Swiss-Prot record:
Source species of the chain: Arabidopsis thaliana (Mouse-ear cress)
The protein's role, per its UniProt record: Competitive inhibitor of the HD-ZIPIII transcription factors in shoot apical meristem (SAM) development. Acts by forming non-functional heterodimers. Part of a negative feedback loop. Essential for proper functioning of stem cells in the SAM.
Residue ranges that the Swiss-Prot or TrEMBL entry lists as coiled coil: 97-122
GO BP terms: adaxial/abaxial axis specification; leaf shaping
Name this polypeptide is given: Protein LITTLE ZIPPER 1
Keyword list, A-Z: Coiled coil, Transcription, Transcription regulation
């Protein structure tokens, strides 16, 4: 942005560059301004950090909207990536836990089968003893 001021036969050009755009306070913007004072006898350059309450230029508005669009997208992408990684870890833990439960279940099934077979044999032995005691 360029502003032209005429003061006491001196022509000064002020180049204003946005230094920082505050997302919280959008009415006042901080600019870095460089003032070039030109006269026939001397050339002078002044730099200062000033605050202007002017309406921002199109470039400043564009930069503001771009920063507001990029930052949430990036943070949203990072947040989604972290949540996906967290979900993957939870899924992996649940998978391992399920595999352990399945193995334990198989062991218990084998044990139940052996106990059932033992119960059958004991029951058949009991039946044979009852039959032999009845026949005596």
């Amino acid at each position: 942005m360029q502003r032209e001021h005429k003061t006491h036969n001196k022509l000064s050009f002020i180049y204003i560059t946005p230094l920082y755009i505050s997302p919280i306070n959008q009415t006042r913007l901080t600019y870095l301004s460089s003032s070039f004072l030109l006269s026939s006898s001397s050339k002078m350059c002044l730099s200062s950090s000033e605050t202007f309450s002017d309406t921002p230029t199109r470039l400043v508005l564009y930069l503001k909207t771009q920063s507001h669009v990029r930052i949430p997208r990036l943070s949203r992408r990072r947040r989604m990536w972290r949540e996906e990684k967290k979900m993957e870890m939870i899924n992996l833990k649940l998978y391992v836990e399920n595999q352990n439960i399945i193995r334990e279940n198989e062991k218990l099934k084998k044990k139940a089968l052996l106990l059932h077979q033992e119960n059958k044999t004991l029951f058949s032995l009991l039946q044979t003893k009852k039959l032999s005691s009845v026949h005596k």
